[in-house]
C-alpha cells in the first residue's frame, strides 16, 4: 500500500518529522518498505503562461514561444513538446535553475532562435509517471509561483506492507486512524455529505447469493460528461499512491478506494439489460474481461449480472463490454460488501490479482458502503456533472457480520504483557481504537469496531493495548519461569540422536515444502489420491505431500544441476494421507526419509570412484535401526513400489508390520525427474521405530569363542536374511554370531544358484565348548538349511 505523506497529514498531522512518522508507523505494526520523495531535487522552476507559440522557421519539431512568468517582460523559450500551445499554463525552468542531475539552465540558441529557459515535463523534474510532453497546469495556476509550492512536491511516498489481519489499513482512512490513536490526536476526515437526488431513476437490484453478498448499493447518475478532465490534485494523489490516471470516472472510483479502502465499480447504464442481479455463475458461463481476455467461470464464482448475462466478477474484475466508454452518458455506481470467503482464492484461480480482490479477500468495513457511495457521487457530479438518482441499498441484516463482543481480564492483560498499564489508559486506548468499552468486575468488555475483523478474542485486545501503549514504553523485565524437569523415558529414541547419526555418515538435513507439485507426486504415488489445496500458493505447490520423497528428489535435481555429484540428504516431517477414519479426513504421519546419489565417497587418490548401490542405503538404514535395538526383528521383503526399481526395492517390516520402503528409483521415473544416475531412497514411519529396547546387562563370557566357516549353495531367489535367521534359530543356545562374508557365482556353481560363505561364532557363558559340541551345532545348522532351502555344502 503506497500513500502520500502530505495526504495523510491532511487527516492527522502529528508534530513529528517524516523519519519519526515512519518509525511510528512501523512500531504500530505496519512495516514500512520504502520512503521516496515524490519529485527530484530542483530549484528555480515557476508557473508560467504561454502567450505566443509559433513554428520554428528551421525545425519542424520545434516551437518558439513567449512565456509570461510574472516578470517585467516575456521570456523567449524554444520548446519541442507537441502539446505546447498558446494559453497553456506550464512549469518554466528560469535562467539559473538547477534540475535533477545537476542540470543548469543557461541562455542558449536553438537553430538560431534564443532560448531563455525551459518548459519542463514531469520526467525532467524527477517526477515519475507516464505523462507525455510538457506539464499542463490548470488555468487558475498563479503565474510566477514556485512549482514546488503549487504542486506540493515537498512530499514523500510511503510504501507499507499490510499484514492480512489489518485490511482496514488498505485505505488512507485506516492508516490515519492508527496514527491519530498513537498520537492522541483527532481525525480530520473530509466532509462526506449526502447527495440529494435530482432524478427519480433507479435500477432494479436483486441479490440471490445473500450469504456471499450481504450488502449491495447501486445508484444511477445520468448525463455525465465522460470526457471531463480529472483535476490535477486528484491525478497527483493517485500518482503518489502508484496509480495512473485513466479517465475521470475510473479515477474517482480509484480515489475512493485509496481514501476509504472501499472498492467501487461503474457500469455503462445503456448496456445493462433490465436490472442488476448478484448471483453465482452458471454452468459454462463465460465473461470477457476489461483486458480483453475470455474466462470460463466456475460455479462458485460470484458475479454481477443483468437479466441476460454476467457483467463482472464480483469483487475481482469488470467485464469489458459494460465498462465506461467515450460514448457513455449514464452510469451505474456499484458499492458492495462481499463475504471474504466468497472472494478468497477466486482471483488466483483465474490468474488475476486486483486492488479490489486484495481488499475483499481480507475484508472491508461492512458499514462503509453508504459513505463511499456518497463520496464517489459527490466527486462524480463535481467533476463530470450529471444528475444523481436515489441510492438503492439491498442489505441482509442476518448475513451481515456482527462485531465481536470481547471480555478483557485485568490479570490476563498483566500476565501476557508483563507490565501493569493503568486502568484509565487501557480504557482510553480501547475507546480511541473505536471500541465500545464498559467496565466489568474482572476488567473490561469491548465491542470491536466494524472495520476491525481481526478483533475476535481476548488476546487480540491485549495485542492492541500493547501496540498503542508502545512496545518501547514497556520496561525490560528478566524472564521468570517455574522450571520443571522434563520426563524422559529411557525407551524413547530421540529423533535428534538419529539425525546426528546420519550427519556422521555424511548426510545433510533438508527441509522441503509440505506443498508439492501434483504432477511430480503422481509419478511417485500413482495409486494414491492426494489432498489438493483449494487456494494454493502456486500451481506447482497445490498438493499436500504423500511422502517426503517428492521434496527430497527435487532437492537432488537442484543440487545436480549445480554440479554437485555426491548428494546425501535426509528429512523428517509430516506426510498427509487422506483417511476417512482420521480427524478431518486427513492422517498426518511423522516420517524419516533419506536419499543418496552419485559416488560412494568423496574423490580421493587412494579410493576408486564407485557409484552408490542398494546396499549403501541399506547399510545406512540398518545403522538407524541398530539404535532401536530391534534390528533382529526387522525384515526386508522384496516388494514392488511404483516409484522403485522392481529388482532393487524392498518393503521394511518390523514384527510383520510394514513400516517403510527402500530402493532404487525406477529408471523410467529417473528420466522423467531429470535425475543424473542411480538414486536410492528410503522412508520410515518414525513412530514405529521411536521406541527402542532398553539395554539389559548380560554376563560377558570368560570362555573362548570358536569360529567355523561353511559355504552353502542355494537358489538365487533365497534371501540371505532367511539363511541367517534359520541358523540363529537352530543354534540359539550356543551360536552368538552369524555373518555372511562372501557371495560367489561362477565356475563350480550351477547357473541359477549362488554360494554363500557364512561364519558361525559359537560360545558358552559357563564353560569351554568341546569340539564335538561345536561340530554338532554346525551340523544342525547345515541340516536345517538343507531341509528348508535345499542347500548343499559346497566342496
From Swiss-Prot:
| Location of the tRNA-binding domain | 39-148
Which ranges carry the B5 domain? 401-476
Q: Among the entry's GO cellular component annotations, what is one?
A: phenylalanine-tRNA ligase complex
**Cofactor note as given:** Binds 2 magnesium ions per tetramer.
Q: Residue ranges of the FDX-ACB domain?
A: 701-794
Q: What class of enzyme is it?
A: ligase
Q: Which InterPro entries does the record cross-reference, listed alphabetically?
A: aa-tRNA-synth_II/BPL/LPL, B3/B4_tRNA-bd, DNA-bd_dom_put_sf, Fdx_antiC-bd, Fdx_antiC-bd_sf, NA-bd_OB-fold, Phe-tRNA-ligase_IIc_bsu, Phe-tRNA-ligase_IIc_bsu_bact
Q: Where in the cell is it found?
A: Cytoplasm
Keywords assigned by UniProt, alphabetized: Aminoacyl-tRNA synthetase, ATP-binding, Cytoplasm, Ligase, Magnesium, Metal-binding, Nucleotide-binding, Protein biosynthesis, RNA-binding, tRNA-binding
Name the reaction it catalyses: tRNA(Phe) + L-phenylalanine + ATP = L-phenylalanyl-tRNA(Phe) + AMP + diphosphate + H(+)
Q: Name one GO biological process term.
A: phenylalanyl-tRNA aminoacylation
Report the domain of life of the source organism: Bacteria
Q: Which residues cross the membrane?
A: none
> Which is one GO molecular function term here?
ATP binding
Matching CDD domains: PheRS_beta_core, tRNA_bind_bactPheRS
- Chief location category: cytoplasm
- Give the binding site residues for Mg(2+): 454, 460, 463-464
EC number(s) per entry: 6.1.1.20
Q: Which cofactor does it need?
A: Mg(2+)
In which family does this protein belong, per the annotation? Belongs to the phenylalanyl-tRNA synthetase beta subunit family. Type 1 subfamily.
Subunit structure, as described in the record: Tetramer of two alpha and two beta subunits.
What is this protein identified as? Phenylalanine--tRNA ligase beta subunit
Supply the source organism for this entry.
Sodalis glossinidius (strain morsitans)
**Name of the gene:** pheT
Amino acid at each position: 500500500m503506497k500513500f502520500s505523506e502530505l495526504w495523510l497529514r491532511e487527516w492527522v498531522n502529528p508534530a513529528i518529522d517524516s523519519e519519526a512518522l515512519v518509525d511510528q508507523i512501523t512500531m504500530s505494526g505496519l512495516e514500512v518498505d520504502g520512503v521516496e520523495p515524490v519529485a527530484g531535487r530542483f530549484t528555480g522552476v515557476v508557473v508560467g503562461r504561454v502567450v505566443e507559440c509559433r513554428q520554428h522557421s528551421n525545425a519542424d519539431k520545434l516551437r518558439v514561444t513567449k512565456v509570461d512568468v510574472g516578470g517585467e517582460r516575456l521570456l523567449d523559450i524554444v520548446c519541442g513538446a507537441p502539446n505546447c500551445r498558446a494559453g497553456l499554463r506550464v512549469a518554466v525552468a528560469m535562467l539559473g535553475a538547477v534540475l535533477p542531475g545537476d542540470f543548469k539552465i543557461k541562455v542558449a540558441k536553438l537553430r538560431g532562435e534564443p532560448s531563455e529557459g525551459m518548459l519542463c515535463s514531469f520526467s525532467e523534474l524527477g517526477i515519475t509517471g507516464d505523462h507525455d510532453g510538457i506539464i499542463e497546469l490548470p488555468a487558475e495556476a498563479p503565474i510566477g509561483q514556485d512549482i514546488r509550492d503549487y504542486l506540493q512536491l515537498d512530499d514523500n511516498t510511503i510504501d507499507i506492507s499490510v499484514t492480512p489481519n489489518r485490511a482496514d489499513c488498505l485505505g488512507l482512512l485506516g492508516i490515519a486512524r492508527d496514527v491519530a490513536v498513537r498520537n492522541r490526536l483527532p481525525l480530520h476526515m473530509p466532509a462526506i455529505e449526502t447527495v440529494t437526488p435530482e432524478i427519480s431513476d433507479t435500477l432494479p437490484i436483486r441479490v440471490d447469493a445473500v450469504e456471499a453478498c450481504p450488502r449491495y448499493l447501486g445508484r444511477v447518475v445520468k448525463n455525465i460528461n465522460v470526457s471531463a478532465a480529472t483535476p490535477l490534485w486528484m491525478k497527483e494523489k493517485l500518482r503518489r499512491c502508484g496509480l495512473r490516471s485513466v479517465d475521470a470516472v475510473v479515477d474517482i472510483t480509484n480515489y475512493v478506494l485509496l481514501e476509504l479502502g472501499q472498492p467501487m465499480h461503474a457500469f455503462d447504464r445503456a448496456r445493462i439489460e433490465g436490472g442488476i442481479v448478484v448471483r453465482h455463475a452458471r454452468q459454462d458461463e463465460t465473461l470477457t474481461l476489461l483486458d480483453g481476455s475470455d474466462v470460463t467461470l466456475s460455479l462458485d464464482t460470484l458475479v454481477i449480472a443483468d437479466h441476460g448475462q454476467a457483467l463482472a466478477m464480483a469483487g475481482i474484475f469488470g467485464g469489458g463490454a459494460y465498462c465506461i466508454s467515450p460514448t457513455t452518458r449514464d452510469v451505474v455506481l456499484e458499492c458492495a460488501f462481499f463475504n471474504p470467503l466468497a472472494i478468497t482464492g477466486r482471483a488466483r484461480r483465474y490468474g488475476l490479482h486486483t486492488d479490489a480482490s486484495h481488499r475483499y479477500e481480507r475484508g472491508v468495513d461492512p458499514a462503509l458502503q453508504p459513505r463511499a457511495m456518497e463520496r464517489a457521487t459527490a466527486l462524480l457530479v463535481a467533476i463530470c456533472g450529471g444528475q444523481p438518482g436515489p441510492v438503492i441499498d439491498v442489505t441482509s441484516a442476518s448475513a451481515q457480520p456482527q462485531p465481536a463482543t470481547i471480555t478483557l481480564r485485568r490479570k490476563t492483560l498483566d500476565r501476557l504483557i508483563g507490565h501493569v498499564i493503568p486502568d484509565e489508559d487501557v480504557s482510553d486506548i480501547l475507546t480511541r481504537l473505536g471500541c465500545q468499552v464498559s467496565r466489568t468486575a474482572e476488567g473490561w468488555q469491548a465491542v470491536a469496531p466494524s472495520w476491525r475483523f481481526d478483533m475476535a478474542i481476548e488476546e487480540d485486545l491485549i495485542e492492541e493495548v500493547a501496540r498503542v501503549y508502545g512496545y518501547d514504553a514497556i520496561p525490560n523485565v528478566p524472564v521468570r519461569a517455574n522450571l520443571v524437569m522434563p520426563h524422559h523415558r529411557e525407551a524413547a529414541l530421540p529423533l535428534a540422536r538419529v539425525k546426528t547419526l546420519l550427519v556422521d555418515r555424511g548426510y545433510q538435513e533438508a527441509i522441503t515444502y509440505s506443498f508439492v507439485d501434483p504432477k511430480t507426486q503422481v509419478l511417485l504415488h500413482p495409486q494414491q489420491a492426494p489432498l489438493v489445496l483449494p487456494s494454493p500458493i502456486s500451481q506447482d505447490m497445490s498438493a499436500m505431500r504423500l511422502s517426503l520423497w517428492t521434496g527430497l528428489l527435487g532437492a537432488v535435481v537442484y543440487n545436480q544441476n549445480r554440479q554437485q555429484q555426491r548428494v546425501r540428504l535426509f528429512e523428517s516431517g509430516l506426510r498427509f494421507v487422506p483417511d476417512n477414519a482420521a480427524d478431518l479426513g486427513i492422517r498426518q504421519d511423522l516420517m524419516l526419509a533419506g536419499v543418496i546419489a552419485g559416488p560412494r565417497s568423496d574423490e580421493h587418490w587412494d579410493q576408486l570412484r564407485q557409484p552408490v548401490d542398494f546396499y549403501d542405503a541399506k547399510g545406512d538404514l540398518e545403522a538407524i535401526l541398530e539404535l532401536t535395538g530391534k534390528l533382529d526383528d526387522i525384515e526386508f521383503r522384496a516388494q514392488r513400489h511404483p516409484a522403485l526399481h522392481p529388482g532393487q526395492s524392498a518393503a521394511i517390516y518390523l514384527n510383520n508390520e510394514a513400516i517403510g520402503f527402500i530402493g532404487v528409483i525406477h529408471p523410467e521415473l529417473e528420466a522423467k525427474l531429470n535425475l543424473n544416475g542411480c538414486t536410492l531412497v528410503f522412508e520410515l514411519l518414525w513412530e514405529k521405530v521411536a521406541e527402542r529396547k532398553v539395554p539389559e546387562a548380560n554376563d560377558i563370557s570368560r570362555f573362548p569363542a570358536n569360529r567355523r566357516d561353511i559355504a552353502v549353495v542355494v537358489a538365487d531367489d533365497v534371501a540371505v536374511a532367511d539363511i541367517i535367521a534359520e541358523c540363529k534359530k537352530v543354534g540359539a543356545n550356543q551360536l552368538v554370531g552369524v555373518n555372511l562374508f562372501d557371495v560367489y557365482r561362477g565356475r563350480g556353481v550351477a547357473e541359477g544358484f549362488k554360494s554363500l560363505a557364512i561364519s558361525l561364532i559359537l560360545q558358552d557363558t559357563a564353560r569351554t565348548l568341546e569340539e564335538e559340541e561345536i561340530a554338532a551345532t554346525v551340523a544342525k545348522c547345515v541340516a536345517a538349511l538343507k531341509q528348508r532351502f535345499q542347500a548343499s555344502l559346497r566342496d
